[in-house]
Amino acid sequence: MCYYLYYRGVSLVLIVTFLSSFIFIVWLPVALVSWFEFGLSSLSSVDDSSLAVLSLPAVFSSAASPDSCLVSLIEVKGEAFICVLELTFVLELTLGEDVLEGGCLLI
């Protein structure tokens, strides 16, 4: 019984190690490169006192699917933020309709 549990634990550790290495070696670099390519291709330069915002794609219509989201990289006085503007009902219920749908993360 002890040997069975030991080998089962070793196999679980190997599976988790493989999956986590796949995420960090394959998926994460691809996601970061695509984010930076999008950010660098459409970043507009302005002075430090104002806001540098990426030129955003076409505005989502109200008929957009609930999982539609718009990711933009903005720079406020030298600090980079990733803003995710989402058209979901979750944000509307959480923040209310009067609040801008979206959130920013300092990077």
UniProtKB/Swiss-Prot annotation:
Transmembrane regions listed in the UniProt entry: 13-33
Main location: membrane
Keyword line: Membrane, Transmembrane, Transmembrane helix
UniProt GO cellular component terms: membrane
Membrane topology: Single-pass membrane protein
Top-level taxon: Eukaryota
Location in or out of the cell: Membrane
More info: Partially overlaps DAL81.
Protein name (database record): Putative uncharacterized membrane protein YIR023C-A
